[in-house]
Amino acid sequence: MTVLVTGGMGYIGSHTCVELLNQGMDVVIIDNLVNSSAEAGKRIERISGRSVTFYEADVRDRKTLDRIFETHDIDCVIHFAGLKAVGESCQKPIEYYDNNIGGTLKLCDVMRNNGCKNIVLSP
């Protein structure tokens, strides 16, 4: 089984990736590294002893999402990509809406177009 983890380089995402890899699943990560670091990918691989495929891109990037689904046979998506700072969200509500709602809608559209019906959302 191949799982796409959005926001997979963040704290919750990276820990989830380790568990998925330990369960024998293949993991593809997309993360724009706004609130994380590519170093997390190295740690995921070191802890699990397995490699991951990483795309440094925004979940709103339709072309990259299309390429991921064309390249990998994605069975399930775990969607952790999202902006979450309450104070900043009040200062930048449109940016948060675009990222959190717009990104989720693009992701769901690409999933639908590729026959992927399994998604886990994290608020």
Outline where the language-model segments fall.
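N-terminal Rossmann-like NAD(P)+-binding domain of SDR-like oxidoreductases, especially those catalyzing
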Residues: 1-123
